[in-house]
């Protein structure tokens, strides 16, 4: 609220209550789903523009499709491989993309794909993730705690403009001391 002198005031108790609510819905060890807007097709209004479909994601280099991005650690734990299909809750199937740097217990899926009647010859491109957004307290968050996954034993090839030179089996970050480097430069 606002004080009489015009200065904005915040209730610290309300902030603590909000943080406690977020922690209570996170589910601890459960998987979380993060839905995001794709850089090229946005919400999907322009999904029928092939120029936008051809524009690869700046991080994954995937174009013409969306996918479920998972961390290498989660992929290993769930025995998932690149381009294997999975279902998230009852959504999908959607191909997996193992993404270094992805948060461990988080799956990310881009919105804006799977739109019907957009002038695309075969009908759709990708999967529409909009049905996954659940209304809570009148809002529609793009974060869903406590999701489940189910493997579909089928592979699906993603269109990528580059699939080499990403990590080449190395750790995400490498650090050393001068002494270690001089002893073993590899």
What are the roles of these predicted feature ranges?
Residues 1-186:
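A cross-kingdom feature strongest in bacterial/archaeal respiratory oxidoreductases
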